[in-house]
C-alpha cells in the first residue's frame, strides 16, 4: 500500500487481492509507436521504422515525426487486433481486483480506443462513458506533401499538392474511457454503494471543473508538474477523476503509472495508492 512497485504490470497485479481496489486510473500505452515502449505489435512499415526513402535522405529529421501508425499501409492492418489482444491480457485482472461498482478511467489513443473498449467489455466491464479532455495545445505532425516531392526533386507534383498534408488534424482532445464493474445480480446500485463505497459520482466536485457537469473537461499542466515523461498527464487532471469517483481513505490503483502523476494526486487527496 502507498508504494510504487517496479516490474511487469501484467504479473504484479496477480498478487493484488480480489475486490480490494476502489478506482483504477491509468494512462496506458496507446499502441501508436510514439516511443519504443509504446510499440505493442510487429510492424514492417518502412516509414514507421525510419527507413523510407524520404527518411533515408533526411537522416534523423523525420525519425520521430509524421509516422504512419495505423492503417496507412497493408503492413499496419494487424495493429488494431494486436492491440485488442494486448488489452485483453490485463483486463480480466483489472476486473478481478476492482470492487463491484468501482470505476476505471483509461486514457486511450483516438485510433485504438475502440479496441480497448471491446477488450474491457469482453472481460466483463460496463462501458459507462467517454470523457473528453480538451487541451490548449498539441503537437501537429502532419507533413506537407509538397515538401516530400520537393526533396525528391519532383517540382511538378510539389506544386500540384501544395496545401495538402500527410497525417491527421491537430489532436486537441484526448478520450478518457470510463468503465464500471457491474454490481451483483439481485441487488441495486444504491445497495452496492453502501456495501462497497463506490458506484456513484460526486457532481459537486466535478462542477468545479465543469459547471454543466458534462463529459467535457479542460485542465492544463502547470509549472509544478515537473515533466518526467513524454506523455505525462497533469496532476490536476488526475485529481479531478479521483475526486469524481472516490472518497478519502479509499484505494487507487495505476497499473501503468509512468511518472506517477496518479499517485501524486492520490496522496494529495488523502487516498491510498498502488502503482
Outline where the language-model segments fall.
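Core catalytic lobe of class I
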Residues: 2-275
Amino acid at each position: 500500500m502507498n508504494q510504487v512497485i517496479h516490474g511487469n504490470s501484467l504479473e504484479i497485479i496477480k498478487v493484488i487481492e480480489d475486490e480490494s481496489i476502489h478506482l483504477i486510473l491509468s494512462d496506458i500505452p496507446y499502441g501508436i509507436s510514439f516511443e519504443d515502449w509504446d510499440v505493442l505489435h510487429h510492424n514492417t512499415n518502412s516509414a514507421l521504422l525510419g527507413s523510407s526513402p524520404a527518411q533515408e535522405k533526411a537522416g534523423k529529421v523525420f525519425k520521430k515525426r509524421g509516422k504512419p501508425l495505423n492503417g496507412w499501409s497493408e503492413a499496419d492492418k494487424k495493429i488494431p487486433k494486436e492491440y485488442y489482444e494486448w488489452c485483453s491480457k490485463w483486463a480480466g485482472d483489472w476486473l478481478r481486483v476492482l470492487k463491484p461498482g468501482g470505476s476505471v478511467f483509461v486514457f486511450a489513443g483516438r485510433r485504438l480506443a475502440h479496441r480497448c473498449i471491446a477488450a474491457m467489455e469482453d472481460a466483463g466491464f460496463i462501458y459507462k462513458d467517454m470523457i473528453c479532455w480538451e487541451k490548449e495545445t498539441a503537437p501537429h505532425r502532419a507533413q506537407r506533401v509538397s515538401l516530400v516531392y520537393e526533396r525528391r526533386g519532383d517540382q511538378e507534383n510539389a506544386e500540384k499538392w501544395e496545401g495538402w498534408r500527410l497525417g491527421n488534424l491537430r489532436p486537441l482532445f484526448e478520450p478518457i474511457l470510463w468503465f464500471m464493474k457491474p454490481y451483483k445480480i439481485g441487488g441495486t446500485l444504491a445497495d452496492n454503494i453502501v456495501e462497497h463505497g463506490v458506484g456513484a459520482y460526486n457532481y459537486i466536485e466535478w462542477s468545479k471543473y465543469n459547471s454543466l457537469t458534462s463529459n467535457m473537461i479542460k485542465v492544463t499542466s502547470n509549472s509544478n508538474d515537473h515533466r518526467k515523461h513524454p506523455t505525462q498527464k497533469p496532476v490536476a487532471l488526475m485529481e479531478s477523476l479521483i475526486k469524481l469517483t472516490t472518497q478519502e481513505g479509499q484505494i487507487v490503483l495505476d497499473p501503468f503509472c509512468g511518472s506517477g502523476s496518479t499517485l501524486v494526486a492520490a496522496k494529495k487527496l488523502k487516498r491510498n495508492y498502488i502503482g
